[in-house]
Amino acid sequence: LPDLPPAMPMEAPRSLIEPQKSRKDPSLPLHALLVFTPHDLHACLSLLDARWEKPHRLFLSDVMVGRYGGTQTAVLGPMLGAPQAVLVLEKAIALGVRRVIAFGWCGSLQPHVAIGDVILPTEAYSEEGTSAHYPVEEPVAPSPSLMKSLRRSLCEAGLTVHAGKVWSTDAPYRETEGKVRAYQARGALGVEMEMAALLTVAAFRRIDLAGALVVSDDLSRLVWRHGFRDPRFLQTRKLLPGRLLEALTAESPSGNRSPSGKG
């Protein structure tokens, strides 16, 4: 594995550009679902009541607000990769979001993690370029309350859930045999593109965030096998939108956390 860059000082200088609400930006509710893929985004939006008439544009993503079970909830997406996901998350926090679930796909790195299973990241090995710009205590972890809600909601639906480490990369076409073996040895369950950066920003800004990743393909045997048409993958994606919204709206954000730029 490549050497890590030198650690940044924990008290970083203030950025010259800070995310903030402009005159044309709407206020957003406390709860938000970040959805990486267009089809899953539409499935999540279909479950909201009393939605806005049209979405608000946020960088390359759309934002829609409605109610789920009586709770005002924002759904944002699609998005691809750490830089875009962090831009959207940073702006969403500036507009009022405090409790976030990220919904995406991942590749399996372990034989016991099957296509159609769900991984709840507990930590992420960063091989993306965004999280290094945010000085935080390492390793960063997801919100305990959101993890508890996710486990309960997904297990109640009969889904197979694995909680563990993931590998976040900027280069899916450079997932080499050597890297896969190295991250397998470190115990990583899956590989994806966004979670290391999202968890880091959530820690830096002191908001609650967790992720749920559907296993879409398999690298565990050092041969790529996709499952994009696998019935198990399709069924899990069908079940997840409602289960994630249930977990997201089950509780309010942690009372001891307020957005910060000091980690």
Residue map of PLM features:
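His/Asp/Glu-rich mid-to-C-terminal helical/loop segments that flank catalytic regions of hydrolases
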Residues: 221-257, 261-263
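Zn-dependent metallopeptidase/amidohydrolase metal-coordination segment
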Residues: 196-232
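Short acidic/polar active-site loop segments enriched in Thr and Asp
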Residues: 98-99, 189, 208
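Active-site rim beta-loop-alpha module in soluble metabolic enzymes
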Residues: 139-186
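Flexible, glycine/charged-enriched surface loops at secondary-structure junctions
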Residues: 52-57, 158-164, 251-257, 261-262
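Metabolite-binding pocket within alpha/beta catalytic cores that recognizes anionic/polar moieties
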Residues: 1-149
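Generic non-transmembrane alpha-helical segments
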Residues: 47, 149-157, 201, 243-251
